[in-house]
Every structure is written in C-alpha cells, then in structure tokens.
Regions:
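Extracellular/secreted glycoprotein ectodomains characterized by long, lumenal stretches
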Residues: 1-194
Length: 194
C-alpha cells in the first residue's frame, strides 16, 4: 500500500463505522441499512469501476465489499459468523495464500491483484488506477489522479472542492449528509432500504 500511495500521491476515502470521509475530506453519516451503498464509482463515460459496501449483521465483520473492475465482480465478505472474509471473483471462491498476490487477467493483461495480509485484503488495479484496502470493518479507497472530478458515490467527486461535495446520483445537491448518503443506497429484494 505504501508503494501505491507514494506512486499516485493523492487523497483517499475511507469508510469506518457509520461514516465515510470523502476524498475532499468531508465526513458523511451513513443511513441504517443492510443494502449496498455506492462508495465510489467512475462516473465518466468510461465507467471503469464501481465500489459498493454493505452492513452484514456480523459483529466481528460488520461490512462486506463488492467491486466491479471493468465487468469483473470482486467480493470480500463473511460467509458465516466465524469464517473470516472470503474472496469471490465472478462468483467463484478464490483461496489466497498469505502475502502472495492473486492475479486476475483479462485478454492477457493483469486487471487486478488481491493480496491478503493477515485479516487485511488489498485489491489493486494498476491499469485502472484503483486501490482498495479492506478488513471487514474499514474500507480504504484510493484512485489515480486522472479520476479527479469524474467520480461519484459516497466518497464524493474528488475535485478538491469541499463546498459542492454532496451531489447525488441524479446531480441533485444535498445540504444534509444523511440524505446525500441515502441517495447512494442500492435497493434490492434482499435488503431493507432506509
């Protein structure tokens, strides 16, 4: 992670507890829901990645992560109360060896790697300029500088402007962080929307 941070030298977003600190350093309160929330997304016409998180109801691992890089789905989630986090790529479980990166390729090009360090997982896509660190409690997101002003989601747009941080998916400007956060909840039949 240190290499990645020093390589890109830009801000990060983190989701911990019941709040998110955006790329532009605004704290956003999260609604009570077990639905996925859009944490960060490339909202440019390229739509290279989407990062989602949800509450699990598991006290030891209260969060699950789902991300899409290109069209590949990455999930880090507990499958039982005492399982620890499990990695699934496109629905298939991937067993990791501590400290040894799992490399996923598409069209003979490395799309991303996943490395486990004890209970901490690092997902890094160098071609797409995306880094995620996740341990089931906290999610750390960092993106390359070329995404500046092109992102949306709970992490904000990464445009260095704190004054206009609370822009929802329909480009509505919110004054309240909780209402802003509710706008990024993804309703589904298996969860309760706020």
């Amino acid at each position: 992670m240190v290499n990645y941070i020093s390589y890109y030298k830009q801000k990060h977003c983190d989701l911990q507890g019941k709040s998110v600190r955006t790329f532009d350093n605004v704290v956003v309160n999260l609604p009570e829901t077990d639905c996925f929330k859009v944490v960060a997304k490339d909202c440019s016409p390229n739509k290279k990645f989407t990062i989602l998180a949800r509450a699990t109801g598991n006290a030891a691992l209260p969060k699950a992560l789902k991300a899409f890089i290109q069209s590949t789905k990455i999930e880090l989630l507990p499958v039982s109360a005492d399982s620890g986090l499990v990695l699934r790529v496109d629905g298939n479980r991937v067993l990791l060896t501590q400290g040894v990166p799992y490399s996923h390729t598409a069209h003979d090009v490395e799309l991303f790697t996943v490395t486990q360090h004890n209970k901490y997982f690092e997902v890094m896509s160098q071609p797409y300029g995306v880094y995620m660190g996740f341990d089931g409690n906290a999610l750390f997101v960092q993106t390359a500088n070329f995404y500046r002003g092109k992102l949306c989601g709970l992490c904000g747009d990464y445009n260095y402007d704190r004054q206009h941080e609370l822009v929802g998916p329909n480009l509505h400007h919110f004054n309240d962080t909780l209402e802003f956060a509710k706008s990024y909840v993804v309703p589904a039949s298996d969860c309760t929307a706020p």
